[in-house]
UniProtKB/Swiss-Prot annotation:
Organism: Rattus norvegicus
Protein name: Putative gustatory receptor clone PTE01
GO cellular component: plasma membrane
Primary localization: membrane
Coiled coil: none
Ranges annotated as spanning the membrane: 1-11, 43-62, 85-105, 139-160, 183-185
């Protein structure tokens, strides 16, 4: 549990740090331009840490599911090796999704010397600046975004559905309270 929390806090800090320093500098200098390479770098890190955040939350939901629904088997199921593997897979998948978004954007033709007048750079902004046809790239990016958003959310909802249904089957109110307090922490 603490492994997930520490990695989640690191991902959240990094997620915020991808845009906040640039925004503060832009406010101080009254300059909202970002270079093409800076935009690609910011977009890559933003996608990496955003996807990592959702995947770690999914792993934490699975951890809570095992703790509530299978409390006697928790130590066997959620051993340190599996926890490390879940964190590693979260990092790997988020890195792949981030690089897939970057590779889709890099395939297009741009005026590479142009500065982009935003403090935040996202793939749709770069697709709008492209000189070539972006229909296929839009489809790929929205499909990958939908999959990388839908799977973690469905995993979280499924885990918490099983947790709530398991808690509601408990006969004693004290057991329900203890289970809900464990789940809420």
């Amino acid at each position: 549990m603490y492994l997930f929390l520490s990695n989640l806090s690191l991902a959240d800090i990094s997620f915020t740090s991808t845009t906040l320093p640039k925004m503060i500098v832009d406010i101080q200098t009254n300059n909202r331009a970002i270079s093409y390479s800076g935009c690609l770098t910011q977009m890559s890190f933003f996608m990496l840490f955003g996807c990592l955040d959702s995947l770690l939350l999914t792993a934490m939901a699975y951890d809570r599911f095992v703790a509530i629904c299978h409390p006697l088997h928790y130590q066997v199921i959620m051993n340190p090796r599996l926890c490390g593997l879940l964190v590693f897979l979260s990092i790997l998948i988020s890195l792949l999704v981030s690089q897939l978004h970057n590779s889709v954007v890099l395939q297009l033709t741009y005026f590479k010397s142009v500065d982009i007048s935003h403090f935040f750079c996202d793939p749709s902004l770069l697709l709008n600046l492209a000189c070539s046809d972006t229909f296929t790239n839009n489809i790929v990016m929205y499909f990958v975004g939908a999959i990388s958003g839908f799977l973690p959310i469905s995993g979280i909802f499924f885990s918490y559905y099983k947790i709530v249904s398991s808690i509601l089957r408990m006969p004693s109110p004290g057991g329900k309270y203890k289970a809900f307090s464990t789940c809420g922490s």
